[in-house]
Amino acid sequence: MRKAALHNLGCKVNAYETEAMEQLLEAAGYEIVSFEEKADVYVINTCSVTNVADKKSRQMLHRAKAKNPDAVVVAAGCYVQAAADKLREDAAVDLIIGNNRKADLVPLLDAWFAGKEIRESITDLAGSNEYEKLHINKQAEHTRAFIKVQDGCNQFCSYCIIPYTRGRVRSRRPEDVEEEVKILAEEGYKEIVLTGIHLTSYGIDFKDEGIDFLTLIKRLHEIDGIERIRFGSLEPRVITEEFASELSRLPKICPHFHLSLQSGCDDTLKRMNRHYTCEEYADRCEILRKHFRNPAITTDVIVGFPAETDADFETTREFLEKVHFYEMHVFPYSRRAGTRADRMPDQVPETVKKERSAVLLKLEKKMSGEYRSSFAGTEQEILLEEPVTINDEVYMTGYTKEYVKAAIRLDGRDPKALKNTFVSGILGDFLTEEILILNEK
């Protein structure tokens, strides 16, 4: 039996596709081993979101070949789409598989081991409207399942290469999504997270059928066994009164919304080619707070974007504090060859990016603590996931619908028996900076 090892780089969509490829290999008779072990096949699902991501992808490919020079090293994913010519010349890489062709992994390996000259499976995504059918019937995480429902992006933000490496928007058939979710529910999963490259574009290619993102959500809400539905990153403009009102009527929806912002300065947003203003973004947050009680609103922020002045940054900081997020993912701007932002003048020095990041991370810590504190004394239900030791005492941790982490005392109970079960109680004091104690009823 041949051994295969896989390594994922990048986003949740990539992670989903890596698990799907792993299951394809298992079904074909491969033994899946750790990437640290010697294997006959190494598959690296690459990322190309920044120049640094490109470098990491190359490093992992060479690391795999160094582990076993006789192994077949497969480069898959976004870096393949961005740099296929370079990979064809790289002696560490044997096979290359682009996005929308990952289902070809096993046939490509079969051809390799049969001595055939086929070395790649790549398509030009610019003109492709085909959604690649990849399925998962089990996941590495045993309580929360990520479901890819959409691929591609039509937004063309000035700093982003993804529309070129992932192609235009392509949606997964709703009945196909339903089938996978039903299988996962039968496997015992109680929570799903819908994910995609530009999630809220779901259904724009199904307009003639009257199918949109909300349609999909409502259909999944009807599936027995699934108790919670979360979303990946959402486009702020999807948050309308109608959308929020409809969601608020669905009890399985988690009031946890990640609205990608990137900057709190209108001038910077314009240079980024984001399609909203700060005022419009703030209005969307208020709509969510109108229809959901104390929802968790999280976001992404890029600091040090080309031409961002000290005044621009201060405008962003003030805006973030005003909106008051639960969590913020703060990224120093990282150049990506092939994007408009990479060619922009007035690139910000790395030292300035680092300083600005530190300011926002300090603000994030403050706001996050304040949001968690707002739940103290409230009755909550958490889905238990894993044990943790705090001050020599063992607890079982889980999350509320808002993704606030809490823990119960085990008191001698078997953590395996508690995993993936719900427990209710009153949230109390902090056990750590990020974990509240849940006093069971």
Name each model feature, range by range.
Residues 7, 76, 195-197, 232-234, ...:
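Generic beta-strand/beta-sheet core signal
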Residues 259, 300, 320, 328, ...:
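Hydrophobic, well-ordered secondary-structure elements that form the walls
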Residues 156, 160-167, 228-237, 263-274, ...:
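Conserved strand-turn element in the central/C-terminal portion of the radical SAM core barrel
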Residues 207-218, 241-255, 308-326, 350-355, ...:
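Short, electropositive alpha-helical surface patch
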Residues 343-441:
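Terminal RNA-binding accessory module
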Residues 53-55, 168-175, 203-209, 271-274, ...:
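Short, solvent-exposed loop/turn segments at secondary-structure boundaries
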Residues 1-202, 218, 242, 257, ...:
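Proteins enriched for Cys/Gly/acidic motifs involved in redox and nucleic-acid/cofactor modification
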Residues 186, 214-215, 219-228, 239-299:
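Radical SAM/AdoMet-radical enzyme domain recognition
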